[in-house]
Curated annotation (Swiss-Prot):
<dbReference type="GO" id="GO:0009376">
    <property type="term" value="C:HslUV protease complex"/>
</dbReference>
<comment type="subunit">
    <text>A double ring-shaped homohexamer of HslV is capped on each side by a ring-shaped HslU homohexamer. The assembly of the HslU/HslV complex is dependent on binding of ATP.</text>
</comment>
<dbReference type="Pfam" id="PF00227">
    <property type="entry name" value="Proteasome"/>
</dbReference>
<feature type="binding site">
    <location>
        <position position="162"/>
    </location>
    <ligand>
        <name>Na(+)</name>
    </ligand>
</feature>
<dbReference type="InterPro" id="IPR029055">
    <property type="entry name" value="Ntn_hydrolases_N"/>
</dbReference>
<dbReference type="InterPro" id="IPR001353">
    <property type="entry name" value="Proteasome_sua/b"/>
</dbReference>
<keyword id="KW-0915">Sodium</keyword>
<keyword id="KW-0378">Hydrolase</keyword>
<comment type="function">
    <text>Protease subunit of a proteasome-like degradation complex believed to be a general protein degrading machinery.</text>
</comment>
<dbReference type="InterPro" id="IPR022281">
    <property type="entry name" value="ATP-dep_Prtase_HsIV_su"/>
</dbReference>
<dbReference type="GO" id="GO:0004298">
    <property type="term" value="F:threonine-type endopeptidase activity"/>
</dbReference>
<keyword id="KW-0479">Metal-binding</keyword>
<dbReference type="GO" id="GO:0046872">
    <property type="term" value="F:metal ion binding"/>
</dbReference>
<keyword id="KW-0645">Protease</keyword>
<dbReference type="GO" id="GO:0005839">
    <property type="term" value="C:proteasome core complex"/>
</dbReference>
<keyword id="KW-0963">Cytoplasm</keyword>
<keyword id="KW-0888">Threonine protease</keyword>
Length: 180
């Protein structure tokens, strides 16, 4: 799966989850087509935050399907995520989609992939996309060695990822989901 062109980072703290995504859209390996794309958004009655890495068209298809699962299961994030991952893995059309999702309701943070993975990180930090490893490392260091809030951590860690990953820029979208 080719995930070049974006970085999505989410960090959970006592107040909830903050998620950030950069805005760069890259055509192939060399051309930046857009600087301010919105890859993190609020879904399901603005109660769930979700971010995507991968093909934009594929991600929108997955957002639609995921939101339908949330409707079907009354906003139950874990149940909707598991059912979405099952469909994603089994369905011939969905299996070809190249994207990953980070989703949160403020209490639970999950990473979903087309291989059927539904992963809740042990430390409350998750990242996807080409700059994901850089953002993840920076966020974990900031989480362990500072008293910054989740929102401050995602903002600073994404800045570091943007310095290291040519497919990640500093035009961030940040969304917060507070614990219920």
């Amino acid at each position: 799966m080719d995930l070049k062109g974006t970085t999505i980072l989410a960090v959970k703290d006592d107040e909830g989850v903050s998620m950030a995504g950069d805005g760069q859209v890259t055509l192939g390996q060399a051309i930046v087509m857009k600087h301010g794309a919105r890859k993190v958004r609020r879904i399901y009655k603005d109660r769930i935050i979700a971010g995507f890495a991968g093909s934009t068209a594929d991600a929108f298809t997955l957002f639609e399907r995921f939101e339908a699962k949330l409707e079907e299961f009354g906003g139950n994030l874990l149940r909707a995520s598991v059912e979405m991952a099952k469909d994603w893995r089994k369905d011939k059309f969905l299996r070809r989609l190249e994207a990953m999702l980070l989703v949160s309701d403020g209490t639970t943070l999950l990473m979903l992939s087309g291989t059927g993975d539904v992963i809740e990180p042990d430390d409350g930090v998750a990242a996807i996309g080409s700059g994901g490893p850089y953002a993840l490392a920076a966020a974990r260091a900031l989480q362990r060695h500072t008293a910054l809030s989740a929102q401050e951590i995602v903002t600073k860690a994404m800045a570091i990822a943007g310095e290291l990953c040519v497919f990640t820029n500093d035009h961030l979208t940040v969304e917060n989901a507070r614990r219920a």
